[in-house]
Amino acid sequence: TYQWFCDVFNVFGLESNFCNVQFPQKLQSLSLTNQLMNAIWSSLILGLIISFPYVLWELWKFISPGLHKNERKKSKGFLFITSLLFFAGVLFSFYVIVPMSVYFFYHFEITDTIQNNFTLSSYISMVTNTLLGVSIVFELPVLIYFLTKLGLITPSFLKIYRKHALVVVLLLAAIITPPDVASQVIVSIPIMILYEVSIYVSRYVVKKQEKSL
């Protein structure tokens, strides 16, 4: 992944710290059962990620009897879209967010007198929390759809706070990425695209509701 970042930056003639990334220190296991428990926990999280479409399917089968026929047809499309966004979030997190976060936290130091020694548990926790967190963020268009249906969100509201959302995204990107603009842009663009898609989704819902009146 770091080599890919390096190659991308080189294409645009930009210098990058990713071209010479080294992690000489090894992760530490501080208890007898630590490696086993982390292996089990990682397997559970991986199983949850892989089984996400099946969990959605089972949830849909539970609520589908209470839906109208046309609603059942549309909800099948939501199963696909929700699963697609979830796995897109997993891939983006695993190949972009996690490597950048690891690089940042590994090299961050307040003073030279403090040495960073990372445990296996902290690493696994950071990776799993990031994977699940980013995957949930990628469900933003689906969330906006339902909030608009309930009348809690409008397209105009999302447009008004677009600049605020951009500032928040850039601040978060600046925190978890190395101090270069290119890295921040790589992280920010997909999230802002999701925000723009959410505006379109909200507008679509409002227009459809107006036609049905």
Give, region by region, the residue ranges found by the protein language model.
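Membrane topogenic/interface segments and analogous intrinsically disordered interaction regions
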Residues: T1-L213
